Amino acid sequence: MAPPTVLVTGGAGYIGSHTVLEMLNAGYNVICVDNLCNAYSSGAKLPEALSRVQEITGKKVNFYRVDITDREQVRSVFQEHKIDMVAHFAALKAVGESCRIPLQYYHNNMTGTNVLLEAMADNNVFKFVYSSSATVYGEPKFLPVTEEHPTGNCTSPYGKTKYFTEEILKDLCKSDKRWAVVSLRYFNPVGAHISGRIGEDPNGEPNNLMPYIAQVAVGRRPSLSVYGSDFPTHDGTGVRDYIHIVDLAEGHVKALDKLRNIAETGFFAYNLGTGVGYSVLDMVKAFEKASGKKVNYTLVDRRSGDVATCYADATLADKKLGWKAERGIDKMCEDTWRWQSQNPNGYANK
């Protein structure tokens, strides 16, 4: 039987590119679309991250520059290829920014997903892996957070787009029994591929902690702003469940394997995390150890929408998908530093 073909949206981004690599290694055929709003491209046919994925795997990546909110562009990809499954990463993803420009977040993250789902249904594609987020839980009512934790009490428009999309997916599965949807609620992805050839390279100022720490360590930025030092945590800074990007990518492959191999349909949600929380300052210290560099930081006010502490109970993913995180904080920092030190300006300095 021919291996399934998976359409990956947002495939040139940080999580998308690492997942494409693991999917190719697992034998899937991959078609990528991305509008390149948060991915480096030199103007070549293939974005740099995907060019390096091809180099690492020795396998071909089909790429189309497509905006998922554009119905015609999306439909043309389905017409050109026989798609079996979709893994949907394409989204705007900065919590703070979403509070400033909510309409753009609702349009991109929700309208884009609806356009994609309509194109899938029109082409009889009903297997869908959704890139969700721990933000659907809002301020945790209990820790660790299980999938039974209430969703919807979100603290940012970004979180709401993920929550509302999950609700749409649940309604879709109820209305049409052909749909099989796995929603992966990830905690905080960090790290890079062990080769140091691909990693996190945000356009402009990083919104996430780890690339910011790495850019300070490599000399690209003078210091890290630590948002909030008065949280009720062991050192006053926010505590998160950081997960290695390769563990996360492997979780997506496990989700695709599940959809490929079972006849079961409906909506399934799984947490992907390590179950361990680290504070911002814990991460700074671990990164200093891994890199041998000093990371200067300043303590500033909290950002709107940030919660104090959040970490996962990921035992359901272990039970149902056969997945668990294998890589710890030291490996996360070592792999990030290898990527950043080999690529001080990200993908722009080949």
From Swiss-Prot:
GO molecular function terms listed in the Swiss-Prot or TrEMBL record: UDP-glucose 4-epimerase activity; UDP-N-acetylglucosamine 4-epimerase activity
Enzymatic class: isomerase
Annotated residues for binding of substrate: 133-135, 186-188, 207-209, 225-227, 240, 303-306
Co-factor requirement: NAD(+)
Keywords: Carbohydrate metabolism, Galactose metabolism, Isomerase, NAD
InterPro entries given in the database record: NAD(P)-bd_dom, NAD(P)-bd_dom_sf, UDP_G4E
CDD domains hit by this protein: UDP_G4E_1_SDR_e
Transmembrane annotation, as ranges: none
Record-listed E.C. numbers: 5.1.3.2, 5.1.3.7
Observed phenotype of the null mutant: Required from embryogenesis through pupation, even in the absence of galactose. Loss of Gale during pupation leads to defects in fecundity, both in male and female. Gale activity toward UDP-Gal is both necessary and sufficient for male fecundity, but Gale activities toward both UDP-Gal and UDP-GalNAc are required for female fecundity. Eggs may require a more substantial pool of specific UDP-sugar substrates than sperm. Individual loss of one activity or the other later in development results in differential sensitivity to galactose.
UniProt GO BP: galactose catabolic process via UDP-galactose, Leloir pathway; larval lymph gland hemopoiesis; UDP-alpha-D-glucose metabolic process; UDP-D-galactose metabolic process; UDP-N-acetylgalactosamine metabolic process; UDP-N-acetylglucosamine metabolic process
Catalytic residues of the enzyme: 158
Quaternary organization: Homodimer.
Family to which this protein belongs: Belongs to the NAD(P)-dependent epimerase/dehydratase family.
Biological function: Catalyzes two distinct but analogous reactions: the reversible epimerization of UDP-glucose to UDP-galactose and the reversible epimerization of UDP-N-acetylglucosamine to UDP-N-acetylgalactosamine. The reaction with UDP-Gal plays a critical role in the Leloir pathway of galactose catabolism in which galactose is converted to the glycolytic intermediate glucose 6-phosphate. It contributes to the catabolism of dietary galactose and enables the endogenous biosynthesis of both UDP-Gal and UDP-GalNAc when exogenous sources are limited.
UniProt protein name: UDP-glucose 4-epimerase
Species this protein is from: Drosophila melanogaster (Fruit fly)
Gene name, Swiss-Prot/TrEMBL: Gale
